[in-house]
């Protein structure tokens, strides 16, 4: 301690720079993320032809086949590398939504059988909407992954056409480039309408779930206060009856029987009877369990909504970067084959390709992380729902077993 206090600030060793990228990778790439990422890249070993067949998009059918034939006719040595890069997009065939819609439907049927009057409450309606929205969010993320792959192929085709245009093949390259630029941007809002729709539904759903959870909390508190007040009033009434019986017993022997009957109806027994009757109608525990389920659903909808916010901003950035490359290609088309202009366009496209590749890779990672978040929140809500369910009766179990045997 003395040596440290006597040392001058100049003698203090310099602190090593903070490795932000390393810390980010350690925090971001958890085990669950790496598992899903390995599933996502399961199809990287497939050939480029089979990949195109499995991930064909509507915009590829409007002249895209002719352009691909034109591009691959060049026979350049970088075709294998480009096809490997274009395969970086993968479809999550191994991803399983948990809990599955079939299990949710089966649980809803079991819950309806336990009721005397099968009707849907507001809590159940909100929970069903939550599971529907998260399922649609999963489908939207899958569609976004397809759009990421289409964006990679779109920009790769753009680069190759510009290289052919720079190489002197003006007529064919210019016609193919004109057709390609007229295609829609794969990351445009019109192409990702499903993603933007489900993104817009998350925030209102989280607000409604939180409002319903607060309402159940107020109902549970009011029920506890009402039960306590009713119990106190019942105890007071029983005490008044006992006092009246004692007064009557002092004036007549008949009062002894009345007093005995009053003592038999003790406040504790009356309170227990009233508690059983109230519990048959509604229980504060029911409100507490339903409130816990709604709280988990509200948290899940909020988290999924924030993840979709991040993904939406990243999609906007990647869309602008890809659109910048398309604008540069339009400038090259209007340049009448001028050599300096084509060289400047090639340099600009090379820089755009590096930025776009990094943005699409980061976007793909965040989409996979969003899928993990969707599964985790759905499992938490299903766990809270299972905690509040009573054990199934033997008749229900027998009926369910018969249904499974019939379906199998």
Swiss-Prot record:
Compartments annotated for it: namely: Membrane
At the top level, the lineage of the source is Eukaryota
Annotated keywords: Membrane, Transmembrane, Transmembrane helix
Map out region (Disordered) in residue numbers: 385-408
Q: GO CC terms for this protein?
A: membrane
Q: Report what the protein is called.
A: Putative UPF0496 protein 2
Which residues span the membrane?
224-244, 252-272
Q: Which family does it belong to?
A: Belongs to the UPF0496 family.
What topology does the record note for this protein and the membrane? Answer: Multi-pass membrane protein
What Pfam families does the record point to?
DUF677 (PF05055)
